[in-house]
C-alpha cells in the first residue's frame, strides 16, 4: 500500500497541495488500494492490532495518515504512535470528504 504514487491528470484530490499526497490520494481510488485495505482489515480482525510503519517519524508527513483516513471512513479506530509511551487517536483530515453511498466507501480530498 505504500510507496510514491503519481498524481492523475483527472485528480479529484486537488485539496492536497503536496503532489506526493495527492498522488497517494488518487491511488486510494483504485481497485489495488481497496484490495490492500481489505487485506489490512483481515489482519486487524485476526489480531485486533496492526501497526503500519514508515520512514517518516510523524504521521502527518506520511501516507499513513491517508490510510488512517480510509480506515476511519470505515469506522476503524486508528491510533498514531508517536513514541514508545505516547499515542493519540487519528483525526480525519480536515478537508477530507467521505462518500458512503459508493461501494467500496470512497474518501477524497477536493
Tell where the protein language model's regions lie, with residue ranges:
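Residues lining hydrophobic/aromatic ligand-binding pockets adjacent to catalytic sites
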Residues: 1-110
Amino acid at each position: 500500500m505504500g510507496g510514491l504514487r503519481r498524481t492523475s491528470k483527472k485528480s479529484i484530490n486537488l485539496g492536497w497541495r503536496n503532489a506526493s499526497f495527492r498522488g497517494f490520494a488518487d491511488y486510494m481510488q483504485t481497485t489495488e488500494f481497496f484490495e490492500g485495505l481489505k487485506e489490512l482489515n483481515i489482519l486487524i480482525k485476526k489480531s485486533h492490532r496492526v501497526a503500519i510503519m514508515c520512514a517518516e517519524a510523524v504521521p502527518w508527513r506520511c501516507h499513513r495518515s491517508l490510510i488512517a483516513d480510509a480506515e476511519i471512513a470505515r469506522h476503524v479506530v486508528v491510533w498514531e504512535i508517536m513514541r514508545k509511551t505516547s499515542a493519540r487517536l487519528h483525526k480525519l483530515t480536515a478537508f477530507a470528504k467521505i462518500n458512503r453511498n459508493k461501494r467500496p466507501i470512497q474518501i477524497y480530498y477536493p
